[in-house]
């Protein structure tokens, strides 16, 4: 399937359009809130893995306010994963089916999108407190980049 486009906010409140990353392999890591233990661990894990995935763009998306994301990323030393806020329009959550309307949060999920905007891997984590299958997502990425 073709990856839907969406617009989220950077930690500096600048709109960011997913289509601007076309031409790269991308991991989209959806988390309910960076201020929770599993979301924290998920974002740190992808930040660590990014060093071994040259040319791969990794996006973490949550409903956290951009100010909170900026503070958290700075404190956690997140420097290889870009954090984006879906709080304004829920554009990502609506496009990818991660929006939990009653809570106005995005559920935990991981997507791998290839350079041609085709979704190659999808995981919606059924229990919000569980980790995603990192290895399955990363294996998909490695195959796409030939490493």
Task: For the regions a language model picked out, list residue spans one by one.
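Chalcogenol-based redox active-site neighborhoods
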Residues: 1-147
């Amino acid at each position: 399937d073709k990856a839907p486009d969406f617009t989220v906010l950077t930690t500096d409140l600048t709109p960011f359009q997913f289509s601007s990353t076309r031409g790269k392999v991308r991991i989209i890591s959806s988390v309910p809130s960076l201020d929770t233990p599993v979301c924290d661990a998920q974002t740190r894990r992808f930040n660590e893995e990014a060093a071994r995935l040259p040319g791969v763009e990794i996006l973490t998306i949550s409903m956290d306010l951009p100010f909170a994301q900026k503070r958290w990323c700075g404190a956690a030393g997140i420097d290889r994963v870009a954090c984006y806020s879906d709080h304004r329009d829920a554009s990502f959550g609506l496009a990818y089916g991660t929006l939990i309307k009653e809570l106005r949060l995005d559920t935990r999920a991981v997507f791998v999108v290839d350079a041609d905007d085709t979704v190659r891997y999808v995981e919606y984590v059924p229990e919000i407190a569980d980790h995603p299958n990192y290895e399955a997502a990363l294996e998909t990425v490695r195959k796409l980049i030939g490493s």
